[in-house]
UniProtKB/Swiss-Prot annotation:
Topology in membrane: Multi-pass membrane protein
Protein family membership: Belongs to the UPF0182 family.
Name of the protein this chain belongs to: UPF0182 protein BCG_3215c
Annotated compartments: Cell membrane
Protein species of origin: Mycobacterium bovis (strain BCG / Pasteur 1173P2)
GO cellular component: extracellular region; plasma membrane
Keyword annotations from UniProtKB, A to Z: Cell membrane, Membrane, Transmembrane, Transmembrane helix
Pfam families in the cross-refs: UPF0182
């Protein structure tokens, strides 16, 4: 029967076409509009920072990759459709009610839409996905050699880092493209009659057979290429149940030959498939494909399984020995743990020490860190916040400076940033939020080895940090009483101010000064930002774009925006670095430092790979998750790496946001490749000023990754490695409130890298024996410019108490538990244990130091300000304990042991420093006059009567009320609080 006339699609009216076009236009605008706005804003932002070349390079690469991938994939699919259409049968017999006829009619009626639209849509999708691999393509184009060859194939490691990922990407796209072309060709032949399923056997036209068979043959050829590339990827493969990474005995002797055999079979099958074109017999390619499938099961999976079970497992240690050695060598190379970086020394850990020997360790005993940066933030807030909208992070930072005597000291440091979330009432108005409250004010540093007085001295500030402040003073001049001079203490960029939604500030001269700056006893002083940073906001185009970006109409209508206005946004230091260097992974800890009289944020940047041959694949989130990261919810994003380098040190100016990248690792091939992709963006290491080098520190995240790997890869013998008997463990944090690994600690102590008594700034960690609580090693990473990056590992034999056992011994000591029981009795004070430091002292000894804090009440509320009350120590199973370091050392080693320990900082009893002598942060309201001595924190076995306990609680409440009134500038409430304080002290003195 002849073919029926095709049913035509109903035609759309002109009005319907217009409505459809409008609807499509709206959809495109909704989808593309925000992205175009973001792209334009990024173009402005990168240009303002001086990194527009980064933006244009990324954009151009993405566009080119998208177009090329889209054209190639779409073109291959289009070719499959076009060939099927051009070679369709001239006459197609049609049975009654044939459903294919209806589809054929629809396709013929919209032939261009189907023939071009489907490949275009597939190509567009492929291009969008492909552009996300722009970095892989750039590394392929610019990557070089490592100068190290893999032990199996003898290829330079640059092949695995830069070339192999690109080849695998291209192969994946070709497989997908050809498969989609096969599907498109198959469907098109079916619709146009080249394939007919009617009747008993159906029919297949010659053109359909040739095209489909050819596409299948190409797929098989591509599979052969995949088998070839699989050989190289074996070197980064981990077989289940093995304690090492990389190709083992089974992989080299079974899987690798199997890949070659399968590749040969695939080539034979491809030839068989192509032969069907001439032989016109589809049974041959069918047999070939079945053979390939069976071969992959028998040769590719079955044979390696037999070798593993019969040959390897019974003799695993000997069989895998060579490959374990490869993994040890490669992992050490990939993570910077080679012999030129890591020095191992034997250390007894339990040698006896005399008072004279301990006192001679001046670099350690004079720098014992008492301030825990995870605990003292509330004290910073209490004494240095000044205004409700200023804020300090929950975890403060550690840095080092020279004190007034030229001695190296570590300090707990913090920038007093603006926290927009703490604005209240009218302060939250858009104008106030974005044009008045724009910046923080001040750099606060506290010597980490001392406090402002003994806690049971008769003054209200005993046990609290001593604050050194750089701040804009009450007369508008900069007061630099900090550890280093600072010209500009105003802070427009920082992690606190950026940790809010819509973290932008509108600055610049537009009439009178508008930004809140500081207060005097008379009025509030204003300020206008004068920095070079910021995107101009004066033009109507810019105002419209930012109004759309932030969904805020005030950009268009507010008169606070003038021709000189700028907008500051993207103010997080780490995110700014990641934006201008998208190839970097940044450290989770960003810290402020004064460098050349400027306040900068220092950010550590890493280059990483995930396919370094024979190197262990490590999860950054797991390796860096210590108790601090868990407690402060600061876990890094999950990313697996097998190679890492701290290749870049970056600074972000806290005032104008300038980002500067410095080359830290001059040998890193990955960094060299990126420096070719983005020339001129990274400054050479020689440009690092000495003042900056003095504040660069060994990064925490890298150290935590390295210590976890050193737990295994310090072992040299492959047989011992396989048995895991000599592995170490990262100790758990012994603090009862912690639930993860003990964090490493920055300290100033004697120089272990040089093995002398000079003071050195270092990052340290204890290591336990495998699955035990005894010490196995002590790791120190030097941050001194001369020895930066050197790791020193003290290996400890015998059974020396680890952190958990030391903490248990201290907390259960009768004198300690009795004293703290009295202090915390009836919930008068909440006891908190600080960081447990492990310090090498004397010749072969290890001293544990643990500060003890107390805060009023039993809760952990924000109004509870912990202060140092005791110092606990342990040395060789003996516990020392007292109000000061000297007392604890004397209790451990005898008189004279604390002779070189830093004493408590002198403090005028109960009188806070005056603004002229040592200015506190700007604050409204009265300054407290001399206060009658508050009762001391109980020491020893002291029993308080219920009346005295009640009076103490009234005293604490009155002091809190006075401080609140001082912040608010409420003189009446302040006077009332002082009266309550006097009455409470009288009650305490009169109580029996």
């Amino acid at each position: 029967m002849g073919m029926r006339s095709a049913a035509r699609m109903p035609k759309l009216t002109r009005r319907s076409r217009i409505l459809i076009m409008i609807a499509l236009g709206v959809i495109v605008l909704l989808l593309a509009g925000p992205r175009l706005i973001d792209a334009y804003v990024d173009w402005l932002w990168f240009g303002e920072l001086g990194y527009r070349s980064v933006f244009t390079t990324m954009l151009a690469t993405r566009i080119v990759v998208c177009l090329v991938a889209g054209v190639v994939v779409g073109g291959i699919v289009f070719g499959g459709l076009a060939l099927a259409y051009r070679t369709r049968p001239v006459f197609v017999p049609d049975a009654d009610n044939d459903p294919v006829a209806r589809y054929r009619a629809v396709v013929l009626a919209r032939l261009r839409l189907v023939g071009i639209g489907i490949p275009a849509a597939i190509g567009l999708l492929a291009g969008i996905v492909a552009q996300s691999y722009w970095a892989r393509i750039q590394l392929f184009l610019h990557g070089g050699d490592f100068g190290v060859r893999d032990p199996q194939f003898g290829r330079d490691l640059g092949f695995y880092a830069f070339e192999l990922p690109f080849y695998r990407l291209m192969l994946s796209y070709m497989l997908v493209s050809v498969f989609l072309a096969f599907v498109a060709n198959l469907v098109a032949h079916y619709i146009f009659g080249g394939i007919r399923l009617s009747g008993r056997t159906g029919a297949l036209s010659r053109s359909a057979r040739v095209q489909l068979v050819s596409l299948v043959g190409v797929l098989v050829l591509l599979k052969a290429v995949a088998y070839w590339l699989d050989r190289y990827e074996l070197l980064s493969h981990t077989r289940g149940g093995k304690p090492f990474t990389g190709a083992g005995y089974t992989d080299i002797n079974a899987v690798l030959p199997a890949k070659l055999i399968l590749m040969a079979i695939a080539l034979i099958c491809a030839a068989a498939v192509f032969s069907a074109i001439a032989l016109r017999d589809l049974r041959i390619p069918a047999i070939g494909l079945v053979l390939l499938l069976l071969s992959s099961l028998i040769v590719g999976a079955g044979w390696p399984l037999i070798v593993e079970q019969i040959s390897v497992k019974p003799n695993a240690a000997q069989k895998e020995s060579e490959y374990i050695s490869r993994s040890i060598t490669a992992t050490r190379q990939a993570y910077g743990l080679t012999s030129d970086v890591v020095t191992y020394r034997n250390y007894s850990g339990d040698s006896p020490a005399t008072a004279e020997q301990v006192a001679a360790d001046r670099a350690t005993t004079s720098n014992i860190r008492l301030l825990d940066p995870t605990i003292v933030s509330p004290a910073f807030t209490q004494f240095q916040q000044g205004k409700n909208f200023y804020y300090f992070p929950d975890q403060l930072s550690i840095d080092r400076y020279l004190d007034r005597n030229g001695n190296l000291r570590d300090y707990v440091v913090a920038a007093r940033e603006l926290n927009p979330d703490r604005l209240i009432d009218n302060q939250r108005d858009w104008i106030n939020r974005h044009t008045v409250y724009t910046h923080g004010n001040g750099f606060i540093a506290s010597p980490a080895n001392t406090v402002r007085g003994i806690a049971n001295d008769p003054n209200q500030n005993g046990g609290y940090p001593e604050f050194l402040v750089n701040v804009v003073g009450a007369n508008g001049t900069v007061v630099s009483d900090g550890p280093a001079p600072l010209d500009q203490p105003r802070i427009y960029f920082g992690p606190v101010i950026s940790n809010t939604s819509a973290d932008y500030a509108i600055v610049g001269r537009n009439g009178d000064d508008r930004e809140y700056d500081y207060e005097t006893n008379i009025d509030t002083k204003r300020y206008t930002y004068t920095g070079s940073g910021g995107v101009p906001l004066g033009g109507w185009l810019a105002r419209s774009v930012f109004a759309a970006k932030f969904a805020e109409r005030n950009f268009l209508f507010s008169n606070v925006i003038g021709s000189n206005s700028k907008i500051l946004f993207n103010r997080d230091p780490a995110q700014r670095v990641e934006a201008v260097a998208p190839w970097l992974t940044t450290d989770s800890a960003v810290y402020p430092a004064i460098v050349n009289k400027r306040l900068v944020w220092i950010v550590d940047g890493y280059t990483t790979l995930d396919n370094y041959p024979y190197s262990e694949l490590t999860s950054l989130s797991s390796a860096t998750a210590d108790s601090n990261e868990v407690a402060f919810n600061r876990l890094v994003p999950d990313k697996k790496v097998s190679y890492i380098r701290n290749s870049v040190k970056a600074t972000v100016d806290a005032y104008d946001g300038t980002v500067t990248l410095y080359q830290q690792d001059e040998k890193d091939p990955v960094l060299k490749a990126w420096m070719q992709v983005f020339p001129g963006t990274v400054k050479p290491k020689s440009d690092i000023a000495p003042e900056l080098a003095e504040h660069l520190r060994y990064p925490e995240d890298l150290f935590k990754v390295q210590r976890m790997l050193l737990a295994k890869y310090h072992v040299n013998d492959p047989v011992t490695f396989f048995s895991t008997s000599d592995f170490w463990d990262v100790p758990l944090d012994p603090n009862p409130t912690a639930s993860s690994y003990q964090p490493p600690y920055y300290i100033v102590a004697k120089n272990i890298a040089k093995d002398d008594n000079s003071a050195s700034y270092q990052l340290i960690s204890a290591m336990n024996r495998f699955k035990r609580d005894y010490l196995a090693a002590y790791i120190s990473a030097s941050s001194d410019p001369a020895t930066y990056g050197n790791l020193t590992v003290l290996t400890i034999p015998g059974q020396v108490n680890g952190p958990k056992l030391a903490n248990n011994a201290i907390t259960t000591d009768p004198a300690v538990s009795q004293d703290l029981g009295v202090i915390g009795r009836d919930n008068q004070n909440r006891i908190r244990w600080g960081n447990l430091l492990t310090l090498p002292v004397a010749q072969g000894g290890l001293l544990y130091v643990e500060p003890v804090y107390a805060s009023p009440g039993a809760s952990d509320a924000a109004s509870s300000y912990p202060r140092l009350i005791r110092v606990a120590m342990m040395y060789n199973d003996k516990v020392g304990y007292g109000p000061t370091v000297r007392d604890a050392l004397t209790g451990l080693f005898g008189p004279g042991a604390g002779a070189t320990a830093t004493g408590i900082a002198p403090t005028e009893a109960a009188v806070p420093p005056s603004p002229a002598a040592n200015p506190p942060p700007p604050a409204s309201g009265p300054q407290p006059p001399p206060v009658t001595a508050a009762p001391p924190v109980p020491v020893g076995a002291v029993t308080l009567s219920p009346a005295k306990v009640a009076a103490l609680q009234e005293i604490q409440a009155a002091i809190g009320a006075a401080r609140d009134a001082q912040k608010k500038g409420d003189f009446a409430a302040y006077g009332s609080a002082l009266q309550r304080l006097d009455e409470a002290i009288t009650k305490f003195n009169d109580a029996g």
